[in-house]
């Protein structure tokens, strides 16, 4: 499968990624394992998930497959933060505190100490854009 450079990061990702939005919700662990095995056998390496998918179950299922189907360092994991359904309603919170807490929970569910691409899932009108951007700016 053809790979492309991910920006200036030095990371190479396959042109086609494996989306896991239904994992843990409509797709059980066995079917998820089959999908992942097929994707890896086809040469794929880029796996997309998010904290909000299945209220974290997508990341949990993926975390259970890492190290079993593929070594962690052979895949590129992308996840997202900033949306939750904790109160039963969609809540967007891109504040520094919320994003860091989302990342910590994602890492725990994935069973890893890092993700390769971490994204803010959606715009938050209540949080100034500078807040999530400034916190990761290096001098």
Mark where each language-model region is.
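Acidic-residue sensor for enzyme active/binding pockets
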Residues: 59, 80, 130-131
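N-terminal small/glycine-rich loop or linker at the start of catalytic domains
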Residues: 7-23, 78-91, 114, 119
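Glycine/proline-rich, positively charged
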Residues: 86-139
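P-loop/Walker A phosphate-binding loop and immediately adjacent motor/lid segment at beta-alpha junctions
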Residues: 70-72, 83, 136
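N-terminal binding-site loop/beta-alpha segment at the start of enzyme catalytic domains
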Residues: 1-76
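Short, glycine/acidic-enriched loop or turn micro-motifs at the edges of active sites
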Residues: 51, 83, 124
């Amino acid at each position: 499968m053809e790979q492309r450079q991910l920006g200036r990061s030095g990371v190479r990702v396959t042109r086609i990624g494996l989306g896991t939005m239904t994992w843990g919700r409509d797709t059980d662990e066995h079917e998820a394992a089959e999908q992942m095995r097929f994707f890896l056998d086809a040469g794929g390496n880029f796996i997309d998930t998010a904290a909000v998918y299945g209220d974290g179950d997508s990341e949990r299922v993926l975390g259970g497959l890492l190290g079993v189907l593929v070594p962690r360092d052979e895949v590129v994991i992308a996840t997202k933060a900033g949306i939750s359904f904790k109160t039963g309603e969609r809540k967007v919170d891109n504040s520094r505190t919320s994003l860091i807490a989302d990342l910590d929970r994602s890492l725990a569910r994935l069973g890893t100490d890092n993700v390769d691409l971490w994204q803010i899932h959606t715009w938050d009108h209540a949080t100034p854009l500078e807040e999530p951007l400034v916190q990761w700016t290096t001098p």
